[in-house]
């Protein structure tokens, strides 16, 4: 169990300040669309409710699914949530073309058949795919580089939504910019659809390195860093105080085996996203169970060994070596 | 005293911090430990089942043999606090507001009927103020995330706090269940009350 110096409530008070700052900016007309969440009690869609949700996903595995059958396999294996997609990242990579949000009818079918949370992806900057998913009632929206970006310059202003968002990041600056835009959860970008964990490892290590560097810097240099990252200084200070990202951070992109999941937990991620790794393997039922077991018990190599024995390496998805991908085939570089 | 938190998945870190805050408020010396294996259960004087996904926590705890161990200990009087998913784990009767009955591994020691996802989905998650006078506190703000509700209690299980049309905190001998998340609150009153049950 990792313990931090601040309680959730203290972190949350800070986020309310950030949200107020956003309100002030929008009231002065600097943002085109102004958020308006009424704060009567009981209050829905508050900053508190949005940041609390990912806490209950920690230690768990979120699985990509494309239909009800897969969603039920995920639920029975002990997934904490499912992410509904039109195509698994591996198939997005193969099929090419523009990748968009999943069919709302399929998302709805999944929502009606399982009890765990249901998430779905929208294109980066696509306010209306997000509005549609919010109207549908999905539990969390992933503004994802796996889909084709709708806006090459801007991400969605997530403070405007009642539904919490998860965003990808490859380093501390990207993560803090997404948090400042109102993301409630971060995931490493990895390199989705490759079955190759190396990029997720790289991003988590960069994040850890940048956080420890930040902590060791004198105040004036931290100010400089805040400017470099294009985020308020207070956000940088919060990271220094906590010695970690102030919100939940999962690992994603290329996780295919129980040992991959345990490795990412050991590197400090709060939980795991598994994309193509499960339903592009030939043993999805067993593999889903094994990855769940390994993620929750990563401190114990004997249990990870037991999980690794539940699957067979020759049934794992065929991986793609990142070095064989052309620069234009990389998904992680979308939306910085 | 040693308090265990079931630490596979969910808000176990938040509970640990909150337990430590409550201990220092009450001037108690104690330790908080993660419970993951059957042998951890032997070490503790009380246990917290955190918020998270009850299916996930149940499946892993059953697989590792912790579920039966905890159940036996609770039946023998081990104080337990179950929040949200934890309350679902403790209930004898569980169903889902939309999907109905589904089989999932549970502890099932408390005479309460729980309905999962009662208020709806994450969009309907909310925060509100509750009155904690009945356990010696004041008003405090708490958050309900995809929360269940306690529909009814029987035998010697009793409702402690109600909100709108349902019970949000219930007690039965050594067992406490809340459908909200006291571990994310500024107030430590629920954890203080739980620790007072361990002292007895």
Curated annotation (Swiss-Prot), chain A:
SUPFAM superfamilies: Ribulose-phoshate binding barrel. Keywords: Lyase, Pyridoxal phosphate, Schiff base. D-glyceraldehyde 3-phosphate binds at residue 205. It comes from the Archaea. It is an enzyme of class 4 (lyase). GO terms for biological process: amino acid metabolic process; pyridoxal phosphate biosynthetic process; pyridoxine biosynthetic process. In the presence of PdxT, forms a dodecamer of heterodimers. Belongs to the PdxS/SNZ family. Its EC number is 4.3.3.6. This is Pyridoxal 5'-phosphate synthase subunit PdxS. PROSITE patterns: PDXS_SNZ_1, PDXS_SNZ_2.
From Swiss-Prot, chain B:
It comes from the Archaea. It catalyses: aldehydo-D-ribose 5-phosphate + D-glyceraldehyde 3-phosphate + L-glutamine = pyridoxal 5'-phosphate + L-glutamate + phosphate + 3 H2O + H(+); L-glutamine + H2O = L-glutamate + NH4(+). Pathway: Cofactor biosynthesis; pyridoxal 5'-phosphate biosynthesis. GO terms for cellular component: cytosol; glutaminase complex. PANTHER family: PYRIDOXAL 5'-PHOSPHATE SYNTHASE SUBUNIT SNO (PTHR31559), PYRIDOXAL 5'-PHOSPHATE SYNTHASE SUBUNIT SNO1-RELATED (PTHR31559:SF0). Catalyzes the hydrolysis of glutamine to glutamate and ammonia as part of the biosynthesis of pyridoxal 5'-phosphate. The resulting ammonia molecule is channeled to the active site of PdxS. This is Pyridoxal 5'-phosphate synthase subunit PdxT. The gene is pdxT.
């Amino acid at each position: 169990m990792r313990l931090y110096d601040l309680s959730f409530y203290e972190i949350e008070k800070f986020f309310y300040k950030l949200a107020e700052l956003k309100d002030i900016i929008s009231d002065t007309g600097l943002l085109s669309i102004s958020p308006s969440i009424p704060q009567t009690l009981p209050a829905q869609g508050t900053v508190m409710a949005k940041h609390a949700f990912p806490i209950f996903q920690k230690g768990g595995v979120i699985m990509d699914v494309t239909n009800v059958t897969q969603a039920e396999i995920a639920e029975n294996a002990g997934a904490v949530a499912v992410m509904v997609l039109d195509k698994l990242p591996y198939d997005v990579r193969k099929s090419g073309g523009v990748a968009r949000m999943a069919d709302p009818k399929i998302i709805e079918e999944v929502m009606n058949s399982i009890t765990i949370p249901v998430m779905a992806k929208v294109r980066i900057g696509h306010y209306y795919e997000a509005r549609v998913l919010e109207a549908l009632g999905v539990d969390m929206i992933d503004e994802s580089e796996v889909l084709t970006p709708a806006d090459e310059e801007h991400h969605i202003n997530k403070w405007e939504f009642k539904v919490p968002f998860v965003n990808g990041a490859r380093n501390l600056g990207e993560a803090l910019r997404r948090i400042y835009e109102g993301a409630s959860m971060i995931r490493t970008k990895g390199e989705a659809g490759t079955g190759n964990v190396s990029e997720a490892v790289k991003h988590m290590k960069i994040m850890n390195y940048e956080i420890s560097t930040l902590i060791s810097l004198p105040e004036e240099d931290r100010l400089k860093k805040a400017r470099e990252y294009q985020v308020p200084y207070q956000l940088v200070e919060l990271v220094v105080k906590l010695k970690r990202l102030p919100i939940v951070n999962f690992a994603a992109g290329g996780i295919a085996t129980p040992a991959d999941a345990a490795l990412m937990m050991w590197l400090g991620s709060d939980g795991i996203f598994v994309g193509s790794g499960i339903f592009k393997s030939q043993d999805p039922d067993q593999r889903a169970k094994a990855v769940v077991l390994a993620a929750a018990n990563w401190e114990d190599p004997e249990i990870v060994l037991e999980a690794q024995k539940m699957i067979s390496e020759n049934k794992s998805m065929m991986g793609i070596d990142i070095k064989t991908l052309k620069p234009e085939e990389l998904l992680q570089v979308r939306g910085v | 005293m040693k308090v265990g938190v079931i630490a596979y998945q969910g808000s176990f870190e938040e509970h640990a911090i909150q337990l430590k805050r409550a201990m220092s408020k009450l001037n108690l010396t104690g330790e908080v430990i993660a419970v993951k294996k059957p042998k951890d259960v032997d070490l503790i004087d009380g246990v917290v089942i955190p918020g998270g996904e009850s299916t996930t926590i149940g499946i892993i705890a059953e697989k590792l043999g912790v579920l039966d161990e905890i159940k036996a200990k609770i039946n023998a009087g081990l104080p337990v606090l179950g929040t949200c998913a934890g309350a679902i784990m403790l209930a004898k009767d569980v169903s889902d507001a939309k999907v109905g009955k589904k089989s999932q591994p549970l502890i099932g020691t408390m005479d309460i009927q729980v309905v999962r996802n009662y208020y709806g989905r994450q969009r309907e998650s909310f925060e509100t103020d509750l009155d904690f006078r009945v356990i010696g506190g004041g008003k405090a703000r708490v958050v309900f995330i995809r929360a269940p509700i306690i529909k009814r209690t029987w035998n010697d299980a009793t409702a402690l706090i109600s909100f709108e049309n349902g019970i949000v905190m219930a007690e039965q001998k050594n067992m406490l269940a809340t459908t909200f998340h006291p571990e994310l609150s500024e107030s430590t009153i629920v954890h203080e009350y739980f620790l007072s049950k361990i002292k007895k």
